[in-house]
UniProtKB/Swiss-Prot annotation:
The record marks R288 as: Interaction with U4atac snRNA. Identified in the spliceosome B complex. Component of the U4/U6-U5 tri-snRNP complex. Component of some MLL1/MLL complex. This is U4/U6 small nuclear ribonucleoprotein Prp31. The gene is prpf31. Residues 84-119, 180-214 form a coiled coil. Keywords: Coiled coil, mRNA processing, mRNA splicing, Nucleus, Ribonucleoprotein, RNA-binding, Spliceosome. It comes from Xenopus tropicalis (Western clawed frog).
Amino acid sequence: MSLADELLADLEEAAEEEEENLIDEDDLETIEEVQEEMQVDLNAESVKSIAKLSDSKLFSEILLKIDGYIKKQPKASEVMGPVEAAPEYKVIVDANNLTVEIENELNIIHKFIRDKYSKRFPELESLVPNALDYIRTVKELGNNLDKCKNNENLQQILTNATIMVVSVTASTTQGQQLTDEELERIEEACDMALELNQSKHRIYEYVESRMSFIAPNLSIIVGASTAAKIMGIAGGLTNLSKMPACNVMLLGAQRKTLSGFSSTSVLPHTGYIYHSDIVQSLPPDLHRKAARLVSAKCTLAARVDSFHESSEGKVGYDLKEEIERKFDKWQEPPPVKQVKPLPAPLDGQRKKRGGRRYRKMKERLGLTEIRKQANRMSFAEIEEDAYQEDLGFSLGHLGKSGSGRIRQAQVNEATKARISKTLQRTLQKQSVVYGGKSTIRDRSSGTASSVAFTPLQGLEIVNPQAAEKKVAEANQKYFSSMAEFLKVKSEKSGTMTQ
């Protein structure tokens, strides 16, 4: 999608939001305010005294008309002009409204059965919360709770886990046996509820089958039941095609408030489209956005159906595909944040020195031969310290045992200690004047001892410096500073000189 398309889509969504917010007061009057007050006479002897829909004239007439139209099977080509002019259209709208009344009637019958059967099995209400499942279970069990065990019919109604819980609870319940009259009333109510449920499914099947030729494109988008509801409340397919999308979204909106309860949880501006399956399949935070989109597409589909175009539903399939494509786009995860690598450091050009002094300094500070041997390892040879018997780093070739001969360390002229020329002359002068002695060391061997073993006396204490003292005393006569001149007789003159 290009940038221009994205901007146009944003403008379209903004326009739809403005249309939703700019709802006239006249439109708000169409929102029906309903107070649900389910008043059931618990003292009624028969269920027919409180549930009168199945015996009503309207109920029987609609079912007869439905059976007649199912047998005829009129074709879409027979419908000419506005759809509202077709006699079957009114039957479809009335049948769709009848399903709502059937739902309310089923709730009344469920409450009647629950109150009557609580005398026999009061815990069953909490174990089976679904109304129809509860009614079927009550009809199957009756007055004998032992039917919970190994009952094939009950396995078609409840799950195995629920059956096990019901059977365990039934064995410990404190309920009382029902009389034959009470049991007969309960079974009558169960039969009525199951018949109403069958009639509701017949109506659903008929509406779905006939909506495919009255409004095929609209029913493809939101389903046949929802399409029939919004057509009925709008006053026909022609009126629906003339309504803007923001008003189509409000069709069927009710302010449902239970008497005595708060109305803060009521969802405003939510109609039949908001509660349709295509919208409710999305996460809750996308429901309103999806309802706006679906209502806009329903308006387009209704305009196509009002002119009897695309009877095969091609436009409806295209619009639904576009809706699903947008739904997928909304639910896509955000793009993965790209991790940018660190930029190369801006190191300036380094100054590289050269010359004789620099080369000598590198030779002096470079690796010694011993360090090179310690860093060197042989391939496929086990080191002597492989078992970590000694702490420290490996010695490499330096730690290998050789022939046993001591090799004199080679002196590297580049790495030996440097002394100045002045210090060299001073040391040389001392070695000449003092016979190589200094205040730290002399030329005598460091291994000389004052104890000696002789064959004559055995252990003998010897002074290693005695020889030096003897030489010094002998030389003191001639080289002493206190010595005097000696008298020497000259052979020629025979005189003595001093």
